[in-house]
Amino acid sequence: MPRNLSPYPETQGYVDAEGSRLFYRSLGNLTSPAVLVVHGGPSDHRYLSVLADLVPNGYRVVWYDQLGCGRSRHPRSFRDYSMEAAGRHVEAVRRQLRLGRPHLFGHSWGGALALQAAVLFPRSFRSLTTCGGFASEASFQRAMRQHVHGLPRAVREPIERNERVGRYGSVEYRAAVRTRQRVYSTGLRVLPYDFAASLSTVNRRLRRAIYGDRPGLLSPATGFLQGWDLQSGLRRLRMPSLVLSGTIEAGRYTARDVHRWLPGSRLVTFAGAAHLPFYQVRDRFMEVLLTFLRSVDRS
């Protein structure tokens, strides 16, 4: 971890979550309203260091590495891990760091975990923001099908053709998947250092525990994500909520579901952005997020 060159206070350490040590990093004044960040991947928190942009605007940002990720504990087995356990870990970080009622932010897979934590502990958080997140396995699978169906023919047809016959290792399938990833998921010609660093840490054992042996983009999940559905829980939530996505990513479809199921939520999509709008349209992204956070703090 690079040393802190910021004029703002930074602390790092560990909290205990059901017997597992989870690494955290905090940047900003301890008296400032806190934003608790849940990363995707499953990789580590570093690619979301861009949210440090919130600190000069009066916020404290707290990141942590999930179980099996980054500098947190890497168990030999994820047999006892689940969406609910991951949600409880979010609450453990909040409670042990004495964050009060922080704003909760989750991206991608972390968006799903943030939603899970909010449903389990609705009184623990001041607000909820998801970016490219999803609220059920069915929504995730449906979104991927819609996304692939809407891709240009040169990308779509090799994916669909090879998926139908299970030819996931073919040259044309892998080339089409790489194109989809580069253009419609990452959306960046040059990967920022923090994103590349996080990408190199993806825990494949944990990914397998979540999704199972899912060979293709359109394959159903067979891990502990299978059958997961927060729809009814979200409909009961009464929490200021912001739902974000790019307009060319699969997450735009799951964002619509989250928005529809979350009472009173606000949906914002970033034109031309893929799965990482905080890199692609950074100024606009921060403007939208700050406006939302400040409106909640004023209310």
Question: Where are the regions a protein language model picked out?
Answer:
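N-terminal cap/lid segment of alpha/beta-hydrolase-fold proteins
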Residues: 2-21
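Conserved HGGG/HGGXW glycine-rich cap/lid loop of the alpha/beta-hydrolase fold
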Residues: 20-74, 79
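Active-site loop/oxyanion-hole signature of alpha/beta-hydrolase fold enzymes
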Residues: 63-109, 287
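Conserved hydrolase catalytic core segment
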Residues: 100-143
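Flexible "cap/lid" loop of the alpha/beta hydrolase fold
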Residues: 126-167
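Alpha/beta-hydrolase
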Residues: 160-239
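Conserved loop-alpha-helix segment in the C-terminal half of the alpha/beta-hydrolase fold
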Residues: 231-273
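Catalytic active-site module of serine/aspartate enzymes centered on a nucleophile-bearing elbow/loop
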Residues: 264-299
